[in-house]
């Protein structure tokens, strides 16, 4: 098949007509039709927040990756734009993989991984991943500039560049895999086109994964955060229950100096579906993160409806007193609110109380008096398969989903915080 932006747009126009909207998100960002995974190129440019994403417009299955594109004035109401990148060049003939976006003067620059095989795709020795550049003056139509970093010798998995400006230089981190050890590699440039290898920023220790995908590196409240998505970490009790994780290392770094870790790897999200998060700065200086709300090899019942996957709501990051990242919905999410009503203070004993009927979307703000409840479990049920509750015996907050007809069953939980209120 010949891939191009015009062919992708024709396919999306046809498929969006037949899309079944029953489960299509009402306020999360999803593709017009087809497949979506990693968020890419989250950036403010010319008064708009631009969100690019990994996209297969020809199918609801993963396939040769394109870059889908949407923009928003408020982070919650999105306007779909034409596909930004298609795998139509020699350097990315098998896919335009994940990357990032930066503003360089009056130009919006996309830096992404060109994915290609030189021979049989079943043989990983034929895999080559290079870093590429595309630029735009209007933020919609992009001119391909070709490869800017070649695959390092002896390496095959080398992807997901994240670029930022620091001082007078551009810096880039790239995820890598060397002898089944995950790495984040560092590069420096004066012009986004000519890059110098600055070495290994961080590398997996035993048990920390064979590949580190989608790295992000930024300053937050005086600390440096290396956020990435490791593959190959084993589950440990309640932790790391998903196939792959997303999380971070905290430490200190200055240009030209090594990254000095201060903490162990910490998962960023303890739910079922959150992967490949990327961050960006708002014009007022807030650090916002958006992730992919699915997981590789998980059932995707929406595929039968002509689409697959969506992105998370924007979350604002901050650093807590215990050196842990805190996430809360960005303040722009409040713009989705409409009618509201209070629920009465309730004390129940082996009872159920219906609070809302026939509600399609809602926001719930809860205050639970955990210190004065003697119930083994108490919480909320949403519809027929979703529960959020406190388990007093385990002293954990639990999210349970049970949709056996779709293969979506299981629980995720976190310890209850100290104190009497939740």
Residue ranges of model-derived segments:
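Surface loop/turn signatures of beta-propeller and other carbohydrate-active proteins
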Residues: 2-40, 59-62, 76-103, 139-165, ...
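Beta-rich accessory regions
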Residues: 9-15, 244-422
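Active-site-proximal structural scaffolding
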Residues: 35, 62-65, 94, 126, ...
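Hydrophobic core segments of beta-strands in well-ordered, beta-rich domains
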Residues: 38-58, 81-82, 98-124, 131-132, ...
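Extracellular structured ligand-interaction cores
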Residues: 39, 64-67, 96-98, 107, ...
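Beta-propeller blade signature
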Residues: 66-74, 129-139, 184-192, 241-256, ...
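Short edge-strand/loop segments of extracellular domains
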Residues: 136, 234-235, 381-385
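Substrate-binding cleft/loops of secretory-pathway carbohydrate-active enzymes
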Residues: 235-236, 245
């Amino acid at each position: 098949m010949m891939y191009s932006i015009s062919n992708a747009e024709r396919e999306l126009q046809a498929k969006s007509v037949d899309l079944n909207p029953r489960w299509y998100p009402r306020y999360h960002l999803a593709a017009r039709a087809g497949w979506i995974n990693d968020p890419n190129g989250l950036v403010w440019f010319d008064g708009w927040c631009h969100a690019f994403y990994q996209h297969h417009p020809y199918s609801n299955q993963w396939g040769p990756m394109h870059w889908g594109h949407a923009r928003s004035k408020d982070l919650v109401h999105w306007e779909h734009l034409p596909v930004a990148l298609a795998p139509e060049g020699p350097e990315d003939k098998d896919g335009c993989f994940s990357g990032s976006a930066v503003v360089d003067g009056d130009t919006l620059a996309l830096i992404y991984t060109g994915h290609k095989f030189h021979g049989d795709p079943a043989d990983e020795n034929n895999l080559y991943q290079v870093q590429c550049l595309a630029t735009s003056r209007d933020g919609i139509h992009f001119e391909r500039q070709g490869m800017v970093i070649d695959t390092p010798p002896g390496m095959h998995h080398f992807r997901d560049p994240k670029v930022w400006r620091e001082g007078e230089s551009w810096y880039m981190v790239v995820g890598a895999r060397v002898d089944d050890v995950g790495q984040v590699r560092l590069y420096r440039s004066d012009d986004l086109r000519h890059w110098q290898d600055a070495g290994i920023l961080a590398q997996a220790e035993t048990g920390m994964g064979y590949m580190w995908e989608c790295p992000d590196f930024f300053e937050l409240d005086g600390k440096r955060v290396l956020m990435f998505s490791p593959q190959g970490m084993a589950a440990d009790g309640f932790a790391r229950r998903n196939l792959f994780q997303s999380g971070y290392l905290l430490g200190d770094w200055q240009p030209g100096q090594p990254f000095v870790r201060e903490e162990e790897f910490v998962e960023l999200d303890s739910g079922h579906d959150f992967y490949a998060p990327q961050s960006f700065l708002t014009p007022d200086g807030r650090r916002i993160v958006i992730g992919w709300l699915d997981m590789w090899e998980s059932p995707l019942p929406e595929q039968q409806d002509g689409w697959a996957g969506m992105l998370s709501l924007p979350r604002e990051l901050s650093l807590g007193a215990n050196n842990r990242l805190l996430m809360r919905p960005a303040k722009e999410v409040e713009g989705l609110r409409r009618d509201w009503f209070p629920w009465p203070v309730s004390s129940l004993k082996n009872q159920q109380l219906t609070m809302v009927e026939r509600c399609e979307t809602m926001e719930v703000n809860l205050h639970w008096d955990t210190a004065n409840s003697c119930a083994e479990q108490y919480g909320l049920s949403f519809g027929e398969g979703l529960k959020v509750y406190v388990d007093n015996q385990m002293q954990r907050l639990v999210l349970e989903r049970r949709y056996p007809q779709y293969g979506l069953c299981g629980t995720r939980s976190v310890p209850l915080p100290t104190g009497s209120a939740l």
